[in-house]
Amino acid sequence: SLYVNTIPVFIDAGVGTYTKQTFGKDRYTIWTMQSNYHNLPMINGVPQKFGQQYKATNTVCNEKKRIFSADIATAYPAEAKVKSWIRSYALDDRKLMITDNYTLNEALAPNQLNFLTWGKVSFPSPGKVRVEVKGQKVELDYPSQFKAELETIKLDDPRLSNVWGKEIYRITLKTEEKKATGNYK
């Protein structure tokens, strides 16, 4: 999640009302439990996998420099064909830089980057997404190889709608190219 002046802008939607399904074998059919509805990439068209064996490695955190990075490759199943995917965050007083450096064993499908928000989303120009939430304005700049799409997610569950309102939004940045190595900033 990314907060600006104590206001969440890019969010984790949280868990809806607990039901039998939440604790059963079908829990990962619930959208809030799926990595596609978190601020994570789909690699080679494959989402991050659930289960304790799927986790990031080589995490680095330096609070003084305000940086964090992790290799998230092992959080994805074998069919993602990902050798290495280093996601890095660098925070300064005016911006958060997210960088993805990756190496795939094979490029099978275009990658996509997902971001969830509850704010008003607009696309003022190519390469730019604007999000406004409770008086806070944030701009997400993205590389030209991506096309931005917006999905509206209706919140019928009061446990979610009481926090975020009637709907939230998934911003998806989709690249058209299939490359075995690269980086996104």
Functional labels for PLM-detected ranges:
Residues 1-21:
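Internal mixed beta-strand/loop scaffold within catalytic domains of large alpha/beta enzymes
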Residues 15, 20-185:
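CBM-like, beta-strand-rich accessory domains located in the C-terminal region of large
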